[in-house]
Amino acid sequence: MKFMREEYFKWYSPNLNREIEMLVFGHAGYPVSLFPTSMGSYHENKDQGLIESARWYIEQGLIQIFCPNSIDKDSFYNKKIHPVHRIQNHTWYDKMVCHEIVERVRNNTSSGKVAVAGCSFGGYHAANFAFKHPGYVSHMFSMGGAFSIKSFMDGHWDDDVFYNSPEDYIPGINDHEIWNMDIILGTSNWDICYDANLKLSGVLARRDIPHWLDVRQDREHDWPVWKEMFPHYLSRIKFF
């Protein structure tokens, strides 16, 4: 009988100087790091049914999904601190994901890479991580993502902001691994982030970076369409 294993992890992150919580779904398979939406918890993707939409892949041992919590409340959405500290907090979060999660699980694959995914602002996290670390990422699935962080920075601009703003740093990217990545920008004509996806698609196209701009029809920026997209996109992973 097939089953979907669920495990809870909590550890002290040296990069963030705080505790991090994470759910892991599956007993074996290709690693997928799945980010929550804005200020979301590690259990949000389970609560909203996104994990359930991928149950077949999980039960078959084809994928393992890693769901860390975000620190958006202390980075992009923390208006009580200066933008310098907001982006620094996010930079440390990126290091945590890279060194404490991805580097530990990517050796489970023959390619030494992982897939990353997320909905809404989780799509930003997935895209930004993938494009900053293309040597670690084989697939990037953004569903209803928005990719500019300028609105969070109150006019502040520095290197940390630049190198966490995909539409700004992609034009100068030279890591050949990004041309080998399976990139999907999932959106719809009713999506509030539709224009953001068109813009990022244009940025990628100008660098001749292969990608799929998947535009669904008459669907809102919400979980129902993301639960349709996610299992569809997972089918693109070469599991063996």
Role assignments for model-derived ranges:
Residues 2-240:
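Non-catalytic cap/lid and distal C-terminal segments of serine-dependent acyl enzymes
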